[in-house]
């Protein structure tokens, strides 16, 4: 999957696109231009990846179980390929923060909460955190573990909880249609 990089130094900011968008969405919508002072001054290095939403939760022809399987493949791609790519492009001690809006917020929140040992924080903007509305009533363990509204209240692993507490999490919401 394609990935785009902006900047040379600073903490790593991994951007996940909204709904059915791609890795260049934030450039097209001028968000990269707004971040330019931080990118150009070496405060952050931005990475943006493609989404798989049309191959999973937003694909109405796909069964719920297959949507969850595809989501897990995306999660593993981020953890096993994108995070090492970012670490190689920065340094192994450079913090990684992940952000997105809409479905990108879901991915950002989910990826951080599941692996706070790899991702240091998340900025989740106007996200949907309950995936059951995208599964036509299908619900299993895989849907549960990708739907933060369901699994977080039951999270009891003290090591993971402590890492989440040490991380940074910003949940931003708004009003209106978008």
Task: Enumerate the language-model features and the residues they cover.
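Non-catalytic cap/lid and distal C-terminal segments of serine-dependent acyl enzymes
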Residues: 1-178
């Amino acid at each position: 999957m394609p990935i785009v990089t902006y900047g040379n130094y600073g903490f790593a900011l991994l951007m996940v696109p909204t709904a059915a968008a791609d890795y260049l969405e934030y450039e097209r919508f001028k968000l990269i231009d707004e971040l330019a002072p931080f990118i150009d001054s070496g405060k952050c290095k931005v990475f943006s990846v493609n989404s798989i939403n049309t191959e999973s939760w937003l694909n109405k022809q796909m069964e719920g179980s297959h949507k969850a399987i595809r989501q897990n493949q995306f999660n593993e791609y981020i953890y096993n390929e994108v995070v090492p790519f970012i670490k190689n492009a920065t340094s192994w001690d450079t913090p990684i923060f992940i952000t997105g809006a809409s479905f990108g917020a879901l991915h950002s929140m989910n990826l951080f909460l599941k692996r706070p040992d790899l991702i240091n924080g998340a900025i989740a903007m106007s996200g949907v955190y309950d995936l059951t509305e995208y599964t036509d009533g299908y619900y299993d363990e895989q849907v549960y573990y990708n739907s933060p509204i369901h699994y977080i209240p039951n999270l009891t692993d003290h090591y993971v909880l402590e890492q989440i507490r040490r991380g940074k999490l910003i949940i931003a919401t708004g009003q209106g249609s978008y």
